[in-house]
């Protein structure tokens, strides 16, 4: 049995679409037909569905053998896992966004403090970072901050709130990670699963 931690939300939707495209229907249908279950089984695979930021923790602690998670999570802090593969879905990017007329930044709201701090330091810009856990756009709309650092996929949410993308910071994609011990103990199962996803270690 191979246990896989999968990030709920947008990334899981992208995974399901990818599984459909490669006709890995047993897994895609299981994920589609979930109701409120957080633990699902199909064939020799057990899926645990968790918040994205918790995926590497479940893998690191050995509860899950494999994790599928956005690189944004892995960039925020170090986890003792094998960061194994780029996955061909879940593409988006980090960006600085603000009101169209904004040209200077003193305060920035973000859920991704490390990414924001690294970016502004690289530009020689001294900003105050305010950590929020959701709806960071609102902080800019009500003028609590001058701008935000957030994940952008289509830009629809920014546009709906009167914000525009100012700077592209870095690309984000889905990553496949493994528990370090499981990578050796369950190497055949892990390699079989990777083959079933039609990706290669060359994508690392």
Swiss-Prot record:
Q: Which controlled-vocabulary keywords does the entry list?
A: Amino-acid biosynthesis, ATP-binding, Cytoplasm, Glycosyltransferase, Histidine biosynthesis, Nucleotide-binding, Transferase
The keyword Amino-acid biosynthesis appears for this protein: yes
Intracellular or extracellular location(s): Cytoplasm
Q: Which GO terms describe its biological process?
A: L-histidine biosynthetic process
The yes or no answer to whether the keyword Cell inner membrane is present is no
Query: What's said on domains?
Result: Lacks the C-terminal regulatory region which is replaced by HisZ.
- What does this gene product do? Catalyzes the condensation of ATP and 5-phosphoribose 1-diphosphate to form N'-(5'-phosphoribosyl)-ATP (PR-ATP). Has a crucial role in the pathway because the rate of histidine biosynthesis seems to be controlled primarily by regulation of HisG enzymatic activity.
The family database entries (PANTHER family) matched by this protein are listed as: ATP PHOSPHORIBOSYLTRANSFERASE, ATP PHOSPHORIBOSYLTRANSFERASE ATP-PRTASE
> Can you name this protein?
ATP phosphoribosyltransferase
């Amino acid at each position: 049995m191979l246990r896989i931690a999968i990030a709920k939300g947008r990334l899981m939707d992208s995974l399901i679409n990818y599984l459909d495209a490669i006709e890995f229907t047993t897994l895609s249908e299981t994920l589609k037909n979930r109701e409120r279950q957080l633990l699902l089984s199909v064939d020799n695979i057990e899926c645990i569905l968790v918040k994205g930021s918790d995926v590497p923790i479940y893998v690191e602690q050995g509860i899950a053998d494999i994790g599928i998670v956005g690189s944004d999570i892995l960039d925020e802090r170090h986890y003792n896992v094998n960061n194994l593969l780029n996955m061909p879905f879940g593409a988006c990017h980090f960006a600085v966004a603000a009101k169209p007329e904004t040209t200077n930044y003193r305060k920035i709201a973000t859920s991704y403090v490390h990414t924001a701090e690294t970016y502004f330091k690289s530009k020689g810009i001294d900003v105050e970072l305010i950590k929020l856990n959701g709806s960071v756009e609102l902080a800019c709309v009500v003028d609590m901050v001058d701008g935000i650092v957030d994940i952008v996929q289509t830009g629809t949410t920014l546009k709906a709130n009167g914000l525009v993308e100012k700077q592209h910071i870095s690309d984000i994609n889905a990553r496949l990670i493994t528990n370090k011990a499981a990578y050796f103990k369950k190497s055949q199962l892990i390699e079989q699963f990777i083959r079933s996803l039609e990706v290669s270690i060359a994508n690392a």
